[in-house]
Regions:
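Short, well-formed alpha-helical segments that are part of the catalytic scaffolds
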Residues: 7-34, 44-46
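Short beta-strand-to-loop acidic/aromatic patch adjacent to the donor-nucleotide binding site
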Residues: 83-96
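Conserved donor-nucleotide/metal-binding helix-loop-beta segment in metal-dependent transferases, i.e.
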Residues: 94-130
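Conserved nucleotide-sugar donor-binding
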Residues: 159-175
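Donor nucleotide-sugar recognition loop
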Residues: 176-189
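C-terminal catalytic/acceptor-binding lobe
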Residues: 187-265
C-alpha cells in the first residue's frame, strides 16, 4: 500500500505567535504531508488562520470539550482522507522542531515506517538533553507521569512530549476507544495500542522535542532579563505546579483505566 503521510495538530494562538514560522515553513509543510489538519480554537488569530491555510493545513475552527477531543478531531480528519502514516504534533512543537532540528524531523516518518514489526503507534519522546531543557515544574511533573507509564509498560517511556505517530490501523483503534478530554490522551493513546499489541508500540527519542515555548515569546523573554528569568517567572508558580501535578495524576490514571489492573501483557 502506498504511504500517505499526514500531519494532525492542534492550535490555540490568539496572539498570532505561530504565524511567522508557519509562513516561513509553509512550503516544507505542503511538501512533507499529503494531508494536514489542525483543530483550532475560536480565539485563534485570523493571521494564524491565514498562515495555516497558506501551509495547506485544513483549519477546523471551533471550541471542543478539551484538547483530547481536539486531538481526536485532527487525527480523524486526516485518517478519513486515507492517511496511513500520521504524525500528531502540537504545532508549536512542530515549528520549533523544524526550525532547530530539521534533518531529524525530515527523516522521522521514514524511520518509523521501516520499523519491524510494523508499528501501529510510536511515542515520540525526548532525549535526556532535550527533556532537561524544560522548566523545572515540567521536568518534575512529566518525569512522574513517565515513571508511572514506564511501570505499566515495563520499559523506559516518555509520552508527554506532545507528539506521536500512528498507522492507519493504530488511528482507527485509538479513535474507537479514546475518551479522555484533556492532555491525558498522552498516556491513554499508547495504552490503547499497548493493550492491543505491545510489540507494535515503539518508543523513539528525539532531540527536536526540546523546550519550545520560549521560541514564541522572544519579547517577553527579553523584557524579563533572559530566558531563565522568564521561565522562572512564568512557570515556577503554585498554579503551574497544581495544574501539572493534576495532569500527571490524570495521565497515569488514564493508563491504569485502559489497562485494567495496570498489568500489561
Amino acid at each position: 500500500m502506498p504511504l500517505t503521510r499526514a500531519l494532525a495538530t492542534t492550535v490555540h494562538d490568539p496572539d498570532a505567535r505561530l504565524a511567522e514560522l508557519l509562513l516561513k515553513h509553509a512550503d516544507n509543510l505542503r511538501g512533507a504531508y499529503m494531508h494536514a489538519a489542525a483543530a483550532v480554537t475560536a480565539r485563534t488569530s485570523g493571521k494564524t488562520l491565514d498562515a495555516l491555510r497558506s501551509a495547506g493545513i485544513e483549519a477546523l475552527v471551533g471550541d471542543s470539550a478539551g484538547i483530547g477531543a481536539s486531538r481526536r478531531l485532527a487525527v480523524a480528519t486526516v485518517a478519513d482522507k486515507g492517511a496511513n502514516s500520521i504524525h500528531y504534533c502540537d504545532l508549536d512543537r512542530w515549528l520549533h522542531w523544524r526550525e532547530s532540528w530539521p534533518q531529524e524531523l525530515s527523516g522521522l516518518l521514514a524511520r518509523l515506517e521501516k520499523s519491524r514489526p510494523a508499528p501501529m503507534y510510536a511515542c515520540l519522546g525526548r532525549t535526556t538533553r532535550a527533556f532537561g531543557t524544560h522548566p523545572k515544574v515540567q521536568v518534575a511533573c512529566e518525569d512522574a507521569t513517565n515513571r508511572g507509564v514506564s511501570a505499566a509498560f515495563r520499559r523506559r517511556s516518555d509520552v508527554t512530549a506532545g507528539s506521536a505517530w500512528l498507522s492507519a490501523d493504530g488511528a482507527r483503534l485509538v479513535l474507537s476507544r479514546s475518551v479522555e478530554l484533556s492532555n491525558a490522551t498522552d498516556g491513554e493513546w499508547p495504552a490503547i495500542a499497548w493493550l492491543h499489541d505491545p510489540r507494535r508500540v515503539l518508543q523513539t527519542w528525539c532531540e527536536g522535542l526540546e523546550f519550545e515555548t520560549a521560541t514564541f515569546h522572544s519579547a517577553e523573554v527579553e523584557a524579563a532579563g533572559g530566558r531563565d528569568e522568564w521561565i522562572r517567572a512564568t512557570y515556577d508558580t503554585p498554579a503551574s505546579w497544581a495544574h501539572r501535578l493534576g495532569l500527571a495524576s490524570a495521565t497515569v490514571a488514564a493508563v491504569v483505566r485502559v489497562l485494567g489492573t495496570g498489568e500489561t501483557a
